[in-house]
Amino acid sequence: MTGLERQLTEMLEAPVGALGYELVGLEFIRAGEHSTLRVFIDHENGIFVEDCAEASRQISAVMDVEDPITVAYNLEVSSPGLERPLFKAAHYQQFVGHEVSLVLKMPMNNRRKWKGDILDINGEIVTVTVDGNNEEFALSNISKANLVPKF
């Protein structure tokens, strides 16, 4: 998570929470004129289009006042979806036993991409069973983590 993403998360958790939603996480993708702020929300009863619209209005209002992003961007608000992104240690704990796809910031054993089942989370270290071996990953070295849907 970048410094900006951390700042945005801290800024938006309370307003999104006040609407009754969990701020699962967010991503800011810089792409010149086409930058995107992608915000993932969840609720115990699921997320519907109306929920995303309500959260989008609230987030837009906060962003207009605070103005933390200096470039033009598009705001996207959605549920985490089937390939749910994992941002926090609590997310890994919630999905112990599920398959996860990881992309690392710095390679480990000459690999940046890993896929396996979440075995455990201990502090800031997640253990994933990959091809029968237990591999430990520091959360600070994970640039992207998503659940792998089972069909």
Curated annotation (Swiss-Prot):
Which Pfam families does this chain map to?
Answer: DUF150_C (PF17384), RimP_N (PF02576)
A GO cellular component term found in this entry reads: cytosol
A GO BP annotation: translation
The record's subcellular locations are: Cytoplasm
Source domain of life is Bacteria
> Which UniProt keywords are present, listed alphabetically?
Cytoplasm, Ribosome biogenesis
Q: Does the keyword Ribosomal protein apply?
A: no
First-listed, main subcellular location of the protein, grouped into a coarse class? cytoplasm
**InterPro entries (UniProt xref):** Ribosome_maturation_RimP (IPR003728), RimP_C (IPR028998), RimP_C_sf (IPR036847), RimP_N (IPR028989), RimP_N_sf (IPR035956)
**From the record, what ranges are coiled-coil?**
none
Regions that span the bilayer: none
Annotated NCBIfam families = PRK00092.1-1
Reported function: Required for maturation of 30S ribosomal subunits.
Task: Give the protein family.
Answer: Belongs to the RimP family.
Q: What is this protein called?
A: Ribosome maturation factor RimP
Q: Which gene encodes it?
A: rimP
